[in-house]
Amino acid sequence: MINEIKKDAQERMEKSVEALKNNLLKVRTGRAHPSLLSGISVEYYGAKTPLNQVANVVAEDSRTLAITVFDKELAGLVEKAIMMSDLGLNPMSAGTVIRVPLPPLTEERRKDLVKIVRGEAENGRVAVRNIRRDANGDVKALLKEKEISEDDDRRAQDEIQKLTDAAVKSIDEVLAVKEKELMEV
């Protein structure tokens, strides 16, 4: 029983850390990375289609993304979708290849992005703490039903706290890497 609760809590905490990593990939750091455009969809045959399904996105160099569109007629739509996104990018089309130069980030914009990233990390920590609260509640319920002893309850809560500490530490490490990336000029 307790092992199942701990395993479930650990899996949910790991998913929270992964979700944070995925959210932070979408934050522009001034360095070209294909995941920067992962949230963009294109209207294709009447359906919203993710950009990576209608084009190949690669980092040409540290400041330029190259998008090779599979269907020539889509180039204009892809270009428009990138301009309409709130990323502040200006794509340049040359046939089936669209180049997206990334302008350097201003100091003010970097600081704003750091605030956003810290907020995302705090949301991740809150999610992990909520998972801890749920797991501890499940353990307390077992204690109340007299399925486990008070010693088992205390031990389980200590182990759940260790899982929580590890997840929060992981979140802090991810945050530190992203902040460093953002503040590099």
Curated annotation (Swiss-Prot):
SUPFAM superfamilies: Ribosome recycling factor, RRF. One of its GO terms (biological process) is cytoplasmic translational termination. It holds the Pfam family RRF. GO terms for molecular function: ribosomal large subunit binding. InterPro entries: Ribosome_recyc_fac, Ribosome_recyc_fac_dom, RRF_sf. The keyword Cytoplasm applies. One of its GO terms (cellular component) is cytosol. Keywords: Cytoplasm, Protein biosynthesis. It comes from the Bacteria. It is found in: Cytoplasm. CDD domains: RRF (cd00520). Responsible for the release of ribosomes from messenger RNA at the termination of protein biosynthesis. May increase the efficiency of translation by recycling ribosomes from one round of translation to another. Belongs to the RRF family. This is Ribosome-recycling factor. It comes from Aliivibrio fischeri (strain MJ11) (Vibrio fischeri). The gene is frr.
